[in-house]
Amino acid sequence: MAEVTAAQVKELRERTGAGMMDCKKALNEVGGNMDKAIDFLREKGLAAAAKKEGRIAAEGIVEAYIHGGGRIGVMLELNCETDFVANTDGFKQFARDIALQIAAAKPRYLAKADVPEEELEHEKNILRAQALNEGKPEKIVDKMVEGRISKFYKEVCLLEQEFVKDPDKTINDLVLEKTAKIGERIVIRRFTRYEMGEGIEKREEDFAAEVMKEMNR
C-alpha cells in the first residue's frame, strides 16, 4: 500500500472540510486514491464542504472597509446560497474579518491558480538562483524551490494566508469551517485593495500594521 503523504491529507482536507485524522484514515482505507477518499468521507457523513461544491452560491454581500482616514480601502464580494444567510450577523462579521485580513496582509490574488504563470516562473528562478548562491547541491535545488514557493503563495494568495486573528488557521480553513457551520456553500468571489499613494514614491508608512492592531482589539 502506498504511503499517505501530508500533502495528500492537506489536499483532502481542503476539498472536503473534514478533520485531519479523518482525512488520513480515509486515504489509508482507499490506498491513497483522492476521489475514493472523498467518496469514503461522504459516505461517513464527514465531508462537509464536498457535499456543497456543486451548489450555486449567488447570494451574499459586498463588504466595503475603509481604514484610517481613507488611507486603505477594501471591497470584497462574499457569496452564499441564500439571502437569509447573507443577512445574518455571523455572515456579515465573517465578511468584515476577511476585508480586514485583506487590508492588513496585502494579498494580490485570491488563490494559487490565479497567480500568472510568468510571475510564478520568475519567482522560481529567483529562488533557484538564491539556493545555488547559498552553495546548495544542484540536485536538491528544485525540491528547495518547491518548498520555498509555498511561502510565496502565503504572501500573495488570500486563501493561503494565515488568519491574522488566529495564525493556526488559513483563510481557506475559515471558509471551510464557515461552510460546515452554516450548512451553505461560502465563496470569496473577488476583492480589490487600495492604498493611498500606492506606486508613488513617498515617506514610508506602515498602514497594514495599523489595520492589524485594529483587528486584535
From Swiss-Prot:
One cellular component term (GO) for this entry is:
cytoplasm
Q: Which UniProt keywords apply?
A: Cytoplasm, Elongation factor, Protein biosynthesis
Domain of life, per UniProt, equals Bacteria
Where the protein is mainly located, per its record?
cytoplasm
- What this protein is called in its record is Elongation factor Ts
> What does the sequence similarity comment in the record state about its family?
Belongs to the EF-Ts family.
CDD domains assigned to the protein according to its UniProt record, in alphabetical order: UBA_EF-Ts
Gene3D superfamilies, alphabetized: 1.10.286.20, DNA helicase RuvA subunit, C-terminal domain, Elongation factor Ts, dimerisation domain
Q: Where is this region: Involved in Mg(2+) ion dislocation from EF-Tu?
A: 82-85
KW Cell membrane (keyword) present: no
A Pfam family for this UniProt protein?
Answer: EF_TS
Taxonomic source organism: Desulfitobacterium hafniense (strain DSM 10664 / DCB-2)
Name the residues that span the membrane.
Answer: none
One term of GO molecular function: translation elongation factor activity
Compartments reported by the entry: Cytoplasm
Q: Is Cytoplasm included in the keywords of this UniProt record?
A: yes
Q: Which InterPro entries is this protein grouped with?
A: EF-Ts_dimer_sf, Transl_elong_EFTs/EF1B, Transl_elong_EFTs/EF1B_dimer, Transl_elong_Ts_CS, UBA-like_sf
Sum up the protein's function in the record's words: Associates with the EF-Tu.GDP complex and induces the exchange of GDP to GTP. It remains bound to the aminoacyl-tRNA.EF-Tu.GTP complex up to the GTP hydrolysis stage on the ribosome.
